[in-house]
């Protein structure tokens, strides 16, 4: 009898350890990665890409010879201003979406924000018409000596129907200030030029 009791007491720590492991596995299985606020907002913009952004376009603001600017109905976290731009084209309507995220005269502040926005946008996942697009791009460290830095994130070739869709993170000098923008657009060209293609 004493031998059985001793065996039982020896098993209790092992049983507790086993239960703890099962509990930890159960918790980890329930943890689902969540999108940050910026990813959620940009995801709303990208989700309307197949519709030509028609569901998020607001009132016309400015008309120029080559472009027409509209308000955007989607609010993006921390954005100063969001807009949709329609470009002149003889083939089809071409729209791009832009958000001004920061304007400052301090380069270090701009560089820090640029990195934060990149981290937020990297691996952005959006489901469009049954296809999941995961946007990725290599980080480029900005330099105060370079007046224009842009990082392009794209869904690669795993989603061929979305391969022309790009997200650009831009840091550029504007007079004495530094401006950060996020752009969503369709790139028709195969070259490395940034921004939407315009048909002559």
Predicted segments, located by residue:
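Bacterial Sec-dependent N-terminal signal peptides
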Residues: 1-35
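A structural detector for beta-sheet-dominated domains
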Residues: 43, 71-77, 83-88, 100-102, ...
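Generic hydrophobic, helix-prone segments enriched in Leu/Val/Ile
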Residues: 38-46, 110-118, 182
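A charged, solvent-exposed segment within the mature domains of Sec-exported extracytoplasmic proteins
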Residues: 120-199
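N-terminal leader/targeting segments
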Residues: 30-95, 199-200
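N-terminal Sec-dependent export signals
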Residues: 1, 13, 29-33, 40, ...
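Generic N-terminal leader/processing signal
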Residues: 5-10, 19, 62-64, 68, ...
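Long, charged/polar, surface-exposed segments that mediate recognition or autoinhibition
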Residues: 80-145
């Amino acid at each position: 009898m004493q031998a059985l009791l001793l065996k039982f007491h020896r098993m209790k720590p092992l049983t507790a350890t086993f239960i703890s492991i099962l509990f930890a596995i159960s918790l980890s299985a329930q943890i689902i990665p969540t999108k940050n606020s910026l990813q959620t907002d940009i995801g709303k913009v990208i989700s309307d890409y197949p519709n030509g952004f028609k569901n998020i376009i607001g009132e016309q603001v400015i008309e120029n010879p080559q472009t027409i600017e509209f308000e955007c109905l989607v609010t993006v976290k921390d954005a100063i201003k969001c807009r949709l731009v329609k470009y002149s084209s003889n083939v089809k309507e071409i729209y791009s979406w832009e958000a001004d995220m920061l304007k400052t005269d301090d380069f270090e502040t701009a560089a820090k924000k640029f990195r934060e926005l990149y981290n937020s946008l990297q691996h952005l996942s959006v489901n469009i018409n049954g296809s999941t697009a995961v946007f990725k791009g290599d980080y480029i460290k900005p330099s105060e000596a370079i007046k224009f830095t842009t990082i392009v994130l794209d869904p690669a070739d795993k989603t061929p129907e979305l391969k022309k869709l790009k997200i650009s993170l831009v840091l550029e000098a504007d007079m004495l200030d530094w401006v950060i923008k996020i752009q969503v657009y369709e790139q028709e060209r195969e070259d490395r030029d940034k921004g939407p293609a315009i048909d002559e």
